[in-house]
Regions:
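Terminal amphipathic alpha-helical/low-complexity segments used for targeting or macromolecular assembly
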Residues: 1-98
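Structural signal for interior beta-strand "rungs" in well-ordered beta-sheet cores
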Residues: 94, 99-160
Length: 160
């Protein structure tokens, strides 16, 4: 049902967006965070072994359309953060089982980060990314939007 709703919303002009549409987008982003919605996923029936979910890519684009540019800085003088209101930095707690070493790392809301992932600074994980359990994102690595990374991988320093 979520795929069809996102497809319909994608066709709506931004001037028509209302609170129901924003609630749908929040539901979509939550599904991304849980790993239940993926931009691509394994598909044994596909010649490549993968299926691209275009509805997910459309949902991500919707977030950019729906968001206003706002100041989300914690310490504006030291590190300004001005971006779309729909894609803040993801909230992470110890219960998530993710290790984020201090030193300038960011994970954008709308990405799945599996348990046991280690994030070495500085690194960035963008919206729509899926990072499997036990993976290490090493220093100066950029995990792009919609990137699909398996379990127990090492994304080496400087990778993009």
């Amino acid at each position: 049902m979520l795929p069809e709703q996102i497809e319909r919303l994608f066709e709506e002009p931004p001037a028509q967006y209302n609170e129901t549409h924003f609630a749908l987008f929040r539901e979509f982003k939550s599904a991304l965070n849980r790993g239940e919605a993926r931009a691509a996923e394994p598909d044994a029936g596909s010649p490549t072994g993968w299926r691209v979910n275009t509805w997910v890519k459309k949902g991500i684009l919707l977030g950019f359309r729906m968001g206003a540019v706002i100041d989300m800085s914690v310490d504006r003088a030291r590190q300004p953060f001005i971006d779309k209101s729909t894609y803040p930095v993801r909230s992470v707690t110890p219960a998530d089982g993710i290790r984020i070493v201090p030193g300038g790392s960011s994970i954008r809301d709308g990405s799945f980060i599996g348990r046991g992932v280690v994030c070495m600074p500085p690194m960035f994980i963008n919206v729509g990314a899926y990072v499997g359990e036990g993976t290490m994102i090493d220093s100066h690595a950029l995990v792009g939007s919609c990137a699909q990374i398996g379990h127990n991988c090492h994304i080496s320093a400087g990778s993009q």
